[in-house]
């Protein structure tokens, strides 16, 4: 069975260096129809005749052997036909139809699925990841056909240490975990949030080359406060209100301990937890396990890379970042994470007495120290009265007023409120103190974006730098000019963070490792690209980006003495690698989908 299958790659390592590039055989414990029903090993009609005999498949498949390339072309033809047949239909209908055809392939043949995904990442990432994954989560109970990942619920308390051994793979490198409490900008989706870990891990495989047999999407179901779901007869999760307080934390504790007991070297990514639990769990586990929270730390890294890019676009040295006036709208885990990492960057530039020009707003307006019952996580970024009285601002000031009076260099949205950067706000950005103001509308999915790029370029000026969380087309400004739309999405960082942490064998993921990832991404773009307003690379280059980010994270782990090595590569070998050798080492450890020979044991 695939659950105990193992690769003979290590046995063949030296041989492969001296011979032709033949994939190492994989030893399996299945035969016949069981192989055909296993998406990891199934090759459909691609099994050669010798393998059909070896695995008891002769007669179970049509006699013609179809090559991998022919299978690939056949799927792409079907996909293009679907695109043609759904022309003119609502976007949601088309998106779900595309997701279904990809999901059917994923359920049947993972090797072909990931090759299709890697080769067409620009077209398919928006389907298996943001923004379509949000639509999938909203409809998950109705779309459910085949389980993927593991589900731990409040009813499993006391059983998780044994449950973890129900997962069939003996080795897991990467886990993405959610409790479904804050899915994108869609709120509490309960168990239906499992679509997020699945989509994230698809990106880990496609971008970071994590072996798909070693990934595990996890849903931690502690109930839901979404009344619509509780009343839905098709809802697949627990029909109870969410656990809170120590009851909640005891469930998360038990799961984390179970994972660490079975796979102590696995990297765990926390995803889409509501803000209070996102910060609580990050503080609780980050020094004990190799884990990170993508909403807090991944989003922050991508945003910081873009913010540093805007300084370059203004023709200023990076040290001038300390003088940038930044208005952040959204005081959840993502917005606070961005400010925390930005503050760390300013402190490195100016010293511990840094006095950043950050202004934070939530649904109640500008956050100041005069606010009652202020969130402790927001307190470091709350403005004192003397800091804003000269601007004519006070507690609770609205967004338009803040932008008009602060005249920020950067307006950054992580509010989850679509259209909050309305006409008055965008026109006010035209009066920014910056020669090239930046607008980051980073909320996902598309409908939750704070503004669309067309409005931003029209109302705030053609010289702005623009970035969004979801993909948008570039804007035709006329006269041959293009308004470049950057996708400031975590996919540029989290695969590299996870890969670098894994290959270094890091005991935990430090702020320095995360900052190394952000700075690597920030330096990836050329001066010419930055001058044209292009802050982030093309997603077509995602594997190259991830290799460089992963290498930067690995080097940072080694420098901080957090690395313990991975596989047969120890810490001493990692220490002696040059920058170029580290990048090559990372590339060599990225899985790529090909049909390898299967040997039954």
Curated annotation (Swiss-Prot):
Binding positions for a divalent metal cation per the UniProt entry: 271-272, 295
Protein name according to UniProt: NAD-dependent malic enzyme 59 kDa isoform, mitochondrial
Coiled coil regions, renumbered to chain: none
Keyword check for Hydrolase: no
InterPro entries recorded: Aminoacid_DH-like_N_sf (IPR046346), Malic_enzyme_CS (IPR015884), Malic_N_dom (IPR012301), Malic_N_dom_sf (IPR037062), Malic_NAD-bd (IPR012302), Malic_OxRdtase (IPR001891), NAD(P)-bd_dom_sf (IPR036291)
Residues annotated as catalytic: 129 (proton donor), 200 (proton acceptor)
Cofactor binding note from Swiss-Prot or TrEMBL: Divalent metal cations. Prefers magnesium or manganese.
Ligand binding (NAD(+)): 182, 295, 444
């Amino acid at each position: 069975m695939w659950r105990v299958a193992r690769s003979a790659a290590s046995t063949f390592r030296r041989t492969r260096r001296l011979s032709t590039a033949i994939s190492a055989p994989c030893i399996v414990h299945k035969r016949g129809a069981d192989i055909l029903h296993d998406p990891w090993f199934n090759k459909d009609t691609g099994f050669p005749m010798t393998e059909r005999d070896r695995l008891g498949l002769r007669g179970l498949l049509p006699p013609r052997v179809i090559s991998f390339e022919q299978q690939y072309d056949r799927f792409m033809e079907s996909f293009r036909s679907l695109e043609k047949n759904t022309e003119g239909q609502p976007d949601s209908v088309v998106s779900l139809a595309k997701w279904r055809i990809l999901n059917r392939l994923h359920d049947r043949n993972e090797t072909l699925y990931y090759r299709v995904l890697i080769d067409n990442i620009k077209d398919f990432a928006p389907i298996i990841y943001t923004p379509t994954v949000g639509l999938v989560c909203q409809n998950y109970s109705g779309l459910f056909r085949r389980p993927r990942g593991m589900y731990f619920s409040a009813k499993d308390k006391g059983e998780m240490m044994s449950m973890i051994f129900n997962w069939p793979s003996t080795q897991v490198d990467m886990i993405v975990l959610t409790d479904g409490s804050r899915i994108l900008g869609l709120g509490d989706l309960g168990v239906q949030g499992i679509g997020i870990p699945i989509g994230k891990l698809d990106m880990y495989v496609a971008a970071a080359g994590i072996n798909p047999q070693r990934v595990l999407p996890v849903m931690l179901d502690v109930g839901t406060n979404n009344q619509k779901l509780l009343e839905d007869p098709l809802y697949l999760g627990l029909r109870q209100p969410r656990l809170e307080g120590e009851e909640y934390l005891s469930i998360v504790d038990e799961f984390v301990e179970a994972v660490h007991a079975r796979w102590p070297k696995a990297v765990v990514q926390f995803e889409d937890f509501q803000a209070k639990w996102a910060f609580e769990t990050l503080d609780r586990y980050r020094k004990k396990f190799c884990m990170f929270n993508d909403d807090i730390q991944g989003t922050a890294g991508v945003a910081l890379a873009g913010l540093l890019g805007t300084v370059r676009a203004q023709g200023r040295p990076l040290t001038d970042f300390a003088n940038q006036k930044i208005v952040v709208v959204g005081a959840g885990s993502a917005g606070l994470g961005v400010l925390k990492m930005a503050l760390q960057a300013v402190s490195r530039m100016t010293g511990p007495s840094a006095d950043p020009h950050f202004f934070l707003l939530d649904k109640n307006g500008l956050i100041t120290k005069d606010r009652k019952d202020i969130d402790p996580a927001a307190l470091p970024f709350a403005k004192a009265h003397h800091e804003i009285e000269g601007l004519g601002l006070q507690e609770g000031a609205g967004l338009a007023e803040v932008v008009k009076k602060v005249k920020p260099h950067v307006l950054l949205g992580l509010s989850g409120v679509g259209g909050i950067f309305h006409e008055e706000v965008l026109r006010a950005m035209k009066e920014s103190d910056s020669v090239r103001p930046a607008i980051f509308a980073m909320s996902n999915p598309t409908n939750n974006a704070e503004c669309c790029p067309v409005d931003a370029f029209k109302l705030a000026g053609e010289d702005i730098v623009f970035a969004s969380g979801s993909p948008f087309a570039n804007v035709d400004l006329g006269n041959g000019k293009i308004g470049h739309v950057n996708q400031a999405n975590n996919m540029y960082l989290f695969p590299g963070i996870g890969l670098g942490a894994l290959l270094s064998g890091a005991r935990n993921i430090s702020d320095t490792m995360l900052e190394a990832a952000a700075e690597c991404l920030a330096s990836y773009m050329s001066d010419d690209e930055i001058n044209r307003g292009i802050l982030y690379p093309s997603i077509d280059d995602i594997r190259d980006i991830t290799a460089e980010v992963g290498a930067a994270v690995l080097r940072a782990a080694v420098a901080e003495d957090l690395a313990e090595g991975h596989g047969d590569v120890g810490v001493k070998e990692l220490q002696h690698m040059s920058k170029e050798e580290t990048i090559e080492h990372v590339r060599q450890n990225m899985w790529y989908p090909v049909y390898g020979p299967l040997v039954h044991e």
